UniProtKB/Swiss-Prot annotation:
Protein name per Swiss-Prot or TrEMBL: Phosphoglycerate kinase
Keyword ATP-binding: yes
GO molecular function: ADP binding; ATP binding; phosphoglycerate kinase activity
Organism (species): Shewanella piezotolerans (strain WP3 / JCM 13877)
Top-rank taxon: Bacteria
Amino acid sequence: MSILNMQDLELQGKRVLIREDLNVPVSDGVVTSDARLRASLPTIKLALEKGAAVMVMSHLGRPTEGEFNAEFSMQPVVNYLAKALDCPVRLASEYLDGVDVAVGEVVVFENVRFNVGEKKNDEALAKKMAALCDVYVMDAFGTAHRAQASTHGVGLHAPIACAGPLLAGELAALGKALDNPARPMVAIVGGSKVSTKLTVLESLSTKVDQLVVGGGIANTFVAAAGHNVGKSLYEADLIDEAKRLVAAAQSGGGDIPVPTDVVVAGEFSPTATATLKDVSAVSDTDMIFDIGPDSAEALAEIIKNAGTVVWNGPVGVFEFDQFGEGTKRIAQAIADSNAFSIAGGGDTLAAVDKYDIADKVSYISTGGGAFLEFLEGKELPAVAMLESRAQ
């Protein structure tokens, strides 16, 4: 993969427009989770150190296109960056027809989704954005799977288009895990539905030595193995698909292990009583909410011996502590493992935070949908654009 890197470019006196993923939760005008903002700071600081006049743009939330809505304004992000950066930071509400920006200053554009045509990758809008800069920097891995005006179109028309350090680092880490992984390679795919992760499971089943399924996804595989899953969330219409995936994994020398013990309850609630059962003893009224300790230990042993671990999705309803022990044990096993580990996806990152293992994971991916599409082997439009511009 050949793309230009911002680190390698001369930026002194240049107008540099950086597309970051600053889509953070905001409550009462204050940013409530700053992980994405912290991840973007090194790129912005590097551009400043290189002597650039810096412009930053992002979307925030899902406003109606073409309408200003204070609830989705970038102002709280500007307030955060003003404290985090040792330079002037200001918001530009009107910028498409030109914006004044000085070297050593950061101008944050108002929410790109306030512009009509952003999501449809409107060419006229993209050209206006491109005309604002000498160098366009795509640094938002979290939106790299979307071909939109601020992530794709602008890069086609800017004088120079390159990847920022965050995007470049993300691609390098994912490439290391998927293109030439240290073996054995283990992938843990959780989540509620097989249907939403089917292409990921198909793609990974042929690449990995061990594919571990968790959450509602695992229930479909439990049912496919001939066990009763009671009232658990599962997809009866995908049982044959689950059987096919297991057969495909086994024919390649791998496997998709099914839990031998599970934690069940009669209802989905924070106060539900957790009961441990053998997987063959699940009753018609039970709902499976976690894997049991024997299954968790077996998976921990697999992780302990792995060379590479890709984690996307918890193995139980860890938001409720009585159904969190399986995910907690998996998290601890990843933390203790010498494997190169990558964690990605919103629920996964929440588990990483809850069990305090962030500093023990080799790489934490900032992308949700983009992370999944990369695992599926799909081409990310923003990356394809950068490759074409590097020719």
